[in-house]
From Swiss-Prot:
Protein name per UniProt: Somatoliberin
GO MF: growth hormone-releasing hormone activity; growth hormone-releasing hormone receptor binding; neuropeptide hormone activity; peptide hormone receptor binding
Domain of life the protein comes from: Eukaryota
Naturally occurring in which organism (per UniProt): Ovis aries
Cell compartments where the protein resides: Secreted
Transmembrane feature ranges: none
Family statement drawn from the similarity comment of this UniProt entry: Belongs to the glucagon family.
Cellular component terms per the entry's GO annotation: extracellular space; perikaryon; terminal bouton
Modified residues (Leucine amide): 44
Gene encoding the protein: GHRH
Organism classification: Eukaryota, Metazoa, Chordata, Craniata, Vertebrata
Secreted recorded as keyword: yes
Length: 44
């Protein structure tokens, strides 16, 4: 019983961590694109 609870919460935490990493990756990618756009504007 305790094992099941542990596995459940462990899976939840893992899911939250991977979701957070995914969000960070997306945010970083968007910021990178934005920086590239700004760089292009500055060059023009």
């Amino acid at each position: 019983y305790a094992d099941a609870i542990f596995t459940n919460s462990y899976r939840k935490i893992l899911g939250q961590l991977s979701a957070r990493k995914l969000l960070q990756d997306i945010m970083n990618r968007q910021q990178g694109e934005r920086n590239q756009e700004q760089g292009a504007k500055v060059r023009l």
